[in-house]
Every structure is written in C-alpha cells, then in structure tokens.
C-alpha cells in the first residue's frame, strides 16, 4: 500500500503538507496570479499532481471561469480533491494516472506544484516534456519543485 492509498495518510495529507511547506497557500496564490497574467479568463488548465485538491481549490476561487484537468495517479487523493472542491469539482475533469495517459489538450496553461520529487529523476524530464506537448504555443506553465539533499 502506497502512502497515497493509505486512508490515514490521505485524510491527513493537507495538514501534513501545510506543516512541511511553510507558505503553501501563498505558493498556490502566487502560481494562480502568474498563470492569470497570460491565460484567458475562460482558460482550460492542466493541473499535474491534483490529488488533494489544494491548488485546484485556490485556482477555482481565483478564476471562476477556468476549467481544469486534474491528473494524479492516486484514486484516493482524487477523491479527496473532489470532496475539498465541493461544487467547484464540476469544473474539473479528474484523470487517474500519469501525464502520459492524460488527454492531449491543448491546454491554455499548466501547473505542477511540489509533484516532481515523487518521480525518479529520469522521469522528471519526460513528464515536463509531456506537459509542454499538451500546451498551446506560448501558454504559461508554473512549476515548483521540492528538493531534498542527496548524499554524495
């Protein structure tokens, strides 16, 4: 059982993440502001690592006409996102899986916050390329990466 399929881990995800990442809500707002500078008011936004729904919640409140594709490999985390979003979940298409099996788009914008560290290093570049391939030309992309020290 992975941590994202363990019911106790899933239920405490938001609280733990907010403790581990000071200013998390500000990161979500800043990412939304950056996307809004270039994305249309009716944008279709790709959200990679959407499980939990934290950034989807902030983005959907900031931009009431945006629609989203939320991609996450964990069904339990996507269920958590649906619950967190309430009525705003109607503006989200949820995709259980990884980016390579997600719809092609094209999307008006994309966001990937604190997700890449869950992937092995070789998979990170592949994931970033898959996101870029799904964006319209010139579309904004905001990423934030959580890095851990490595022993050498």
What are these regions (language model features)?
Residues 146-150:
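Short "lid" loop at the C-terminus of a central beta-strand within the Rossmann-like core
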Residues 1-12:
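N-terminal, positively charged/glycine-rich alpha-helical extensions of SAM-dependent methyltransferases
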Residues 138-145:
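Conserved beta-strand signature within the Rossmann-like core of class I S-adenosyl-L-methionine
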Residues 125-137:
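A short glycine-rich, Lys/Arg-flanked "PGG" loop and its adjoining helix->strand segment in the class I
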Residues 102-110:
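A short acidic, Gly/Pro-enriched loop at the edge of an enzyme's catalytic core
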Residues 44-46, 52-101:
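Class I SAM-dependent methyltransferase SAM/SAH-binding core
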Residues 112-116, 144:
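Residues lining the SAM
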Residues 23-41:
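Conserved alpha-helix/loop element of class I SAM-dependent methyltransferases that forms part
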């Amino acid at each position: 059982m992975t941590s994202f399929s363990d019911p106790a881990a899933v239920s405490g995800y938001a609280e733990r993440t907010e403790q581990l990442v000071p200013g998390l809500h500000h990161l979500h707002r800043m990412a939304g502001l950056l996307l809004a500078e270039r994305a249309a008011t009716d944008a279709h936004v790709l959200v990679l690592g959407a499980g939990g729904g934290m950034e989807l919640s902030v983005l959907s409140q900031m931009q009431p006409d945006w629609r989203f594709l939320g991609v996450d490999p964990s069904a339990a985390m996507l269920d958590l996102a649906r619950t967190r979003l309430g009525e705003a979940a109607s503006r989200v298409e949820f995709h259980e899986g990884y980016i390579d099996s997600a719809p092609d788009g094209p999307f008006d914008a994309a966001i990937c916050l604190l997700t890449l560290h869950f992937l092995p290093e070789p998979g990170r570049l592949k994931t970033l390329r898959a996101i870029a391939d799904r964006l319209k030309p010139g579309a904004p992309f905001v990423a934030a990466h959580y890095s851990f020290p490595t022993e050498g």
